[in-house]
UniProtKB/Swiss-Prot annotation:
Organism of derivation: Saccharomyces cerevisiae (strain ATCC 204508 / S288c)
SUPFAM superfamilies membership: FAD-linked reductases, C-terminal domain, FAD/NAD(P)-binding domain
Stated name of the protein: Rab proteins geranylgeranyltransferase component A
TM helices/strands, residue ranges: none
Gene: MRS6
Species classification: Eukaryota, Fungi, Dikarya, Ascomycota, Saccharomycotina
Function: Substrate-binding subunit (component A) of the Rab geranylgeranyltransferase (GGTase) complex. Binds unprenylated Rab proteins and presents the substrate peptide to the catalytic component B. The component A is thought to be regenerated by transferring its prenylated Rab back to the donor membrane.
């Protein structure tokens, strides 16, 4: 039965499936304990691996171990799946904010929430919205997408394409030039700039083999490399580093930036004219639940509302809050948010990710490409009136993503700026987006032929360059209707756009042998909190490293052998078709009614 707080699950929604056969049959999505099926009444006496926390990394790890043959008990202290990667309703967010501010949810601080009276007691219900705690995009050429296909978890999911990437500079929102054709036909680019840009694109696709070009710059910044070696101007440098590479500052080193830029370019046209995908009905929360379902099919046991109290490394017995116990023959893996009381080994979470999630009552279709409902907006350093030193990223999702109703949109803003100025930067980015939205929706816009144009199919498109040029002189005559605003600071041990590596877990491995009297977490291995990285790239790396720590090798990581393996092998041709089909200022704020505040949100 559907809880008043919970949204319909992937098994409860209309059947959706992918098939590599000519005569497809509907896929039956496996049920999951605590959602469609009741939770098990008892806890197993003995398991190979205990995992606490159902976030992305833990869920991928659980599925890999279950299919490898390990006996896995996967628990979560929450009454929902996803942990740090959860997709939550508005009512669940209210509860989460209170728990953060009470200190019962670690690794998060300073949560502030505003909810309009239009949600809950007005025209919208709490379950109309699915809010991600750590939103992500999925590049078309990535390890996670390969595992989604190989494990068949993709069959439980639906995707939409993401092709629009905008850069904000000089009060302008400029759409990213994606293809060679767009580069050559862009009348704003001088001929020499076009040639230099094409020269760089050709280089970056095979950059590792051309050491004579990049090696002298290996310890220098990417902006120096692009300016000196390829004679590119600031607008192109910013687009490559911040919009294509999705880096956070200009100090990123050359090898790392080249890898990130190539990620975007090689993902383009894999499944269509776009580099990235977004899962519908939620992001990491939806994917983590999919991997949990796969793990359950592989034999893993699931229990929600199950809190780990302690683990004794001598007896190898884990004790839970309800008094039940389990003997663990191999490893205990814990998310930092699931650490038991009196834990002494939780890794230091020294990096901050500041996040703001807004729901706006406006479809905001001007941001999207035709037929899409997702976009990325990047605010490079120095582009905002706050004088931001770090990038602010804004991930935009519309009603087509199935996380909000028609006529509304969700904005996810984030920055890695540390301390109080982070909120100033995010507010400045929000104000710039408000101005854009108000300008685009203002009366008389439809008569401005320089800004608004029609496609051959009669669809309206907006010239973002022309639009941005008018921001400085524009004074809005309307106010924006916010339905929801959520600020919070998340802490992580992974540096901005850093890569999770085995050295982090080597520290945890040493802690397995280190006994601290009175500690409830002696002998456990901790996973990592989500980083500021907007893509899923860190997930597979972290899960694979943990898998090797448990099994001894990662050679059989998701080495699956289904009975109809021949169909899996045919995926190379079929998957493109399957994904194409599936990818089917504060004065301006108008808050209707008194609304509801949690924390100390100032609107």
């Amino acid at each position: 039965m559907l809880s008043p707080e919970r949204r319909p699950s992937m098994a409860e929604r209309r059947p959706s499936f992918f098939s590599f056969t000519q005569n497809p049959s509907p896929l039956v999505v496996p049920h999951l304990a605590g959602i469609e099926d009741p939770l098990p009444a008892t806890t197993p006496d003995k398991v190979d691996v205990l995992i606490a926390g159902t976030g992305m990394v833990e869920s991928v790890l659980a599925a890999a171990l279950a299919w490898q043959g390990s006996n896995v008990l996967h628990i979560d202290k929450n009454d929902y799946y996803g942990d740090t990667s959860a997709t939550l309703t508005v009512d669940q967010i209210k509860r989460w904010v209170n728990e953060v501010n009470e200190g019962s949810v670690s690794c998060y601080k300073n949560a502030k929430l505003y909810v309009s009276t239009l949600i809950g007691s007005g025209k919208y219900s709490s379950r109309d919205f699915g809010i991600d705690l750590s939103p992500k995009i999925l590049f078309a050429k990535s390890d996670l997408l390969s595992i989604l296909i190989k494990s068949r978890v993709h069959q439980y999911l639906e995707f939409q394409s993401l092709s629009n990437f905008h850069t904000y500079e000089n009060d302008c929102f400029e759409k990213l030039t994606n293809t060679k054709q767009e580069i050559f036909t862009d009348q704003n680019l001088p001929l020499m700039t076009k040639r230099n840009l094409m020269k760089f694109i050709k280089f970056v696709l095979n950059w590792e083999a051309q050491t004579e070009i990049w090696q002298p710059y290996a310890e220098r910044t990417m902006s120096d490399f692009l300016g000196e070696k390829f004679k590119l101007e600031k607008p192109q440098v910013f687009e490559l580093i911040f919009s294509i590479g999705l880096c956070y500052d200009l100090n990123v080193k050359v090898p790392e930036a080249l890898q990130r830029i190539r990620r975007y370019l090689t993902s383009f046209d894999v499944y269509g004219p776009f580099p990235a995908l977004c899962s519908k009905y939620g992001g990491p929360g939806e994917l983590s639940q999919g991997f949990c379902r796969s793990a359950a099919v592989g034999g893993a046991t699931y229990k929600l509302n199950e809190k780990l109290v302690s683990f004794n490394p001598t007896t190898k017995v884990a004790t839970f809050q309800d008094g039940s116990k389990v003997e663990v023959s191999e490893k205990v893996i814990i998310s930092p948010t699931q650490a038991p009381k009196d834990s002494k080994h939780v890794p230091q979470q020294q990096y901050q990710v500041h996040r703001l999630t807004c729901i706006v009552e406006n479809p905001c279709t001007e941001w999207f490409n035709e037929g899409e409902s997702a976009a990325m907006v990047v605010f490079p350093p120095g582009s905002l009136k706050s004088g931001n030193k770090e990038v602010v990223q804004a991930f935009i999702l519309g009603a087509g993503s199935e996380i909000c109703p028609e006529g509304t949109i969700v904005w996810y803003l984030s920055t890695t700026e540390q301390g109080p100025r982070a909120e100033m930067d995010i507010d400045a980015a929000l104000e710039a987006m408000e101005m854009a939205l108000l300008r685009e929706s203002s009366s008389g816009l439809e008569n401005d032929e320089e800004i608004v144009q029609l496609t051959g199919n009669g669809h309206t498109i907006v010239n973002s360059v022309k639009l941005g040029q008018s921001f400085k002189e524009y004074v809005p005559r309307e106010r924006l209707q916010f339905l929801f605003k959520l600020y919070y600071t998340q802490y992580t041990s992974t540096p901005p756009f850093g890569v999770v590596n085995s050295s982090f877990f080597d520290v945890n491995q040493d802690l397995e042998k280190k006994y601290i009297p009175g500690a409830s977490d002696n002998g456990v291995i901790y996973t990592t909190m989500p980083s500021a990285e907007i893509s899923y790239d860190e997930v597979v790396t972290a899960a694979k490293v943990l898998y090797e720590k448990i099994v001894g090798s990662d050679d059989d990581f998701f080495d699956l052998d289904f009975e109809d393996e021949d169909e899996i092998q045919a995926s190379g041709v079929a998957n493109a078709e399957q994904f194409e089909n599936a990818i089917d200022d504060d004065d301006d704020v108008n808050m209707e009614g008194s609304g509801e505040f949690v924390g100390e949100m100032e609107i």
